[in-house]
Amino acid sequence: MTLNLRVLSPNRVIWDSEVKEIILSTNSGQIGVLPNHASLVAAVDIGVMKIRLNGQWSTMALMGGFAKIDNDRITVLVNNAERDVDIDLKEAQETFKVAKADLARAEGKRQAIEADVALKRARTRLEAISASPPVSN
């Protein structure tokens, strides 16, 4: 049995195919979804989603949103998302370094919150790359 997974952002379809299993980061923790999962609507946190296809895992950095699970169909509506294969490691490392520095020099509560969210997004992109298996040539 499989699940139909669709990941949508406001401007594009990021993923639309059959999968065996997903592990999703929600605001109340991670949940694993297999076929015949109970119906559910959940807030999606900034975090990594793991996707299992025929014995291989893929990852995706999700930047918050909502997920609906119903009758083996999973629809994830996100602010933005990137597949592990689309993330440039050097650029992600540089973004993380800049976000960390911005948080260290943030002045005031608003700047600190914005810098913390930027750091969480940057960390998620790095985690999506490191959580995916190496690509063999």
UniProtKB/Swiss-Prot annotation:
Cross-referenced Pfam families: ATP-synt_DE, ATP-synt_DE_N
Cellular compartment(s): Plastid, Chloroplast thylakoid membrane
Domain of life: Eukaryota
S-S bonds: none
Keywords linked to the UniProt accession: ATP synthesis, CF(1), Chloroplast, Hydrogen ion transport, Ion transport, Membrane, Plastid, Thylakoid, Transport
Primary localisation category: plastid
GO cellular component, one term: proton-transporting ATP synthase complex
MF term (GO), any: ATP binding
Keyword Chloroplast part of the UniProt annotation: yes
Bilayer disposition of the protein: Peripheral membrane protein
CDD domains found in the cross-reference section: F1-ATPase_delta
Assembly description: F-type ATPases have 2 components, CF(1) - the catalytic core - and CF(0) - the membrane proton channel. CF(1) has five subunits: alpha(3), beta(3), gamma(1), delta(1), epsilon(1). CF(0) has three main subunits: a, b and c.
Family affiliation: Belongs to the ATPase epsilon chain family.
Function (record text): Produces ATP from ADP in the presence of a proton gradient across the membrane.
Protein name in the entry: ATP synthase epsilon chain, chloroplastic
Organism the protein comes from: Picea abies (Norway spruce)
Gene, per the UniProt record: atpE
